[in-house]
């Protein structure tokens, strides 16, 4: 599959360029290691044009971006080296040697496994630019892949970040679009002035209520349909007509169900959750949707536990699990919830986009500070569940974070939602809705994400690719030869002597004169840059 995606994908693009007359792409963007073999196909083409492997590698690197989407090593594809031998010892890529391929994915660093081929490592070595998909994920990725840049401080590992975004026209409810069109005269919800007097608190609140009502009606229909399918010929129970309430604080949770997402964290204290759901004055209702991988038995067990809890007669109208989670369901679920819940184990959420889709519709987030929420939470657009990652064990961490979540719902979220004026409008809540729509809508859209990729990564990559291929790729040939020379001589390069002076007891702001005598072996002074790190020495 990965050969088909990477090599076949580039061949398909080349064929399309051929038949359509479209200019050939200058920049290639590899999303995760799965498509990493695209770089090898491009190297093969360049070898066919007269470059050697190392020279072709410089050209490919210049015009390639690699994006990692996983924050854990277990999420990376790794194969036995024998598979590389099997596929690349053929004529699949003429001129590309097996050893050269193997070297790109080799875990030849501290902590690596020399017996495997790592697709992400290959992707990083084939790309001059790399990024994670949120600021926190970029930080995690610099730590996870830091061994590839031996001697670098983690902060200096060359992996940046571009936070994901979502397609606003797809995920913004037509009722919100209609409100903007009616009051402001345009359809651009992400660029709307949500503080404009033309959009009143009553407008916002009635629209939010209508979207909640849509969700309730859809959930009832789905639950009834599922019942009828499982119980043919049996009347649908009357209680399903009262499933959920369009006037009750609604919390949504929907996504895949790997264990790190902690679907059942909300069940940590069942008695406390039951009290929140059945509170006579400030009730809460939960709408949960998701699906587990067919082979994920742990995920299936989480769903079964949740369904069992929700089947209790006193709870079944306040908590519902919607099976067969799909886009049609999601497009009503995100806008219809007042609160979007996300409680992964930090920092295992690379970015997450479900909360973004909810926020585009004025829903507020209740989330662990992970993924995108870590950088966008500002205290007014929702609530942050404190992270207990310093807890002694997983059970203690779950307990602390679950209790914090219950506290936020009971003491902050529900009181704000149900605090109504004489017109029945929760003014403070609507203020948070306005703030969320004003500040997050432009930032969470795919428009912002694409603009950031273009300006920060694609344009520089295209420029680098043009420069390195000038004069029949002379810069690539020169760079490859220079790297080879540096690698050959580097073991003999050493700092022979360092002198410092000018200040006996240096203080912050003082100037310190440093002179270093460096043994350059076969390199010239133009080949190196000498840097000074100043600080307290660490023994050992």
Regions found by a protein language model. Give the residues of each.
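Catalytic cores of carbohydrate-active enzymes across secretory and cytosolic contexts
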Residues: 1-540
């Amino acid at each position: 599959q990965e050969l088909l995606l990477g090599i076949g994908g580039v061949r398909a693009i080349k064929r399309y360029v051929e038949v359509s007359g479209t200019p050939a792409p200058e920049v290639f963007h590899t999303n995760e290691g799965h498509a990493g073999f695209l770089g090898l196909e491009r190297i093969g083409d360049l070898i066919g044009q007269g470059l050697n492997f190392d020279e072709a590698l410089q050209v490919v690197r210049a015009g390639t971006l690699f994006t990692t989407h996983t924050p854990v090593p277990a999420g990376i594809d790794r194969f036995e080296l024998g598979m590389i031998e099997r596929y690349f010892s053929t004529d699949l890529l003429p001129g590309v040697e097996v050893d050269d391929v193997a070297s790109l994915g080799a875990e030849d660093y501290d902590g690596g496994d020399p017996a495997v081929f790592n697709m992400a490592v290959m992707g990083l070595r084939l790309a001059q630019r790399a990024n994670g998909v949120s600021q926190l994920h970029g930080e995690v990725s610099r730590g996870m892949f830091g061994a590839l840049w031996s001697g670098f401080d983690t902060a200096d590992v060359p992996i940046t970040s571009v936070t994901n975004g979502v397609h606003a026209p797809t995920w913004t409810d037509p009722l919100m679009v209609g409100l903007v069109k009616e009051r402001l005269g345009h359809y651009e919800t992400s660029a709307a002035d949500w503080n404009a007097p033309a959009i009143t608190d009553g407008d916002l609140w009635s629209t939010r209520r209508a979207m909640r009502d849509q969700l309730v009606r859809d959930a009832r229909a789905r639950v009834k349909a599922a019942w009828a399918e499982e119980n043919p010929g049996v009347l649908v129970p009357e209680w399903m007509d009262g499933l959920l309430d369009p006037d009750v604080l609604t919390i949504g949770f929907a996504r895949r169900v790997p264990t790190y997402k902690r679907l059942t964290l909300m069940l940590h204290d069942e008695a406390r959750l039951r009290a929140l759901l059945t509170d006579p004055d400030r009730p809460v209702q939960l709408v949960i949707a998701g699906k587990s991988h067919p082979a994920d038995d742990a995920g299936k067990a989480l769903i079964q536990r949740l369904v069992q809890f929700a089947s209790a007669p006193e709870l079944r109208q306040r908590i519902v699990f919607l099976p067969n989670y799909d886009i049609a369901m999601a497009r009503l679920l995100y806008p219809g919830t007042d609160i979007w819940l996300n409680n992964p184990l930090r920092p295992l959420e690379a970015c997450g986009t479900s909360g973004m889709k909810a926020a585009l519709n004025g829903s507020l987030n209740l989330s662990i500070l992970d993924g995108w929420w870590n950088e966008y939470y500002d205290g007014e657009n929702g609530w942050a569940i404190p992270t207990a990652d310093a807890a002694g064990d997983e059970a203690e961490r779950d307990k602390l974070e679950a209790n914090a979540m219950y506290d936020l719902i009971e003491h902050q979220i529900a009181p704000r939602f149900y605090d109504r004026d004489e017109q029945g409008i929760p003014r403070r809540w609507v203020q948070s809705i306005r703030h969320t729509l004003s500040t997050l809508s432009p930032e969470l859209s795919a428009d912002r994400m694409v603009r950031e990729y273009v300006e920060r990564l694609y344009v520089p990559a295209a420029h680098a690719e043009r420069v390195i291929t000038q004069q029949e790729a002379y810069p690539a040939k020169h760079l490859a030869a220079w790297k080879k020379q540096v690698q050959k001589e580097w073991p003999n390069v050493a700092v022979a002597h360092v002198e410092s002076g000018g200040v006996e007891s240096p203080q912050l702001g003082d100037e310190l004169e440093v002179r270093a005598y460096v043994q350059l072996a076969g390199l010239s002074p133009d080949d190196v840059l000498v840097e000074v790190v100043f600080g307290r020495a660490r023994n050992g």
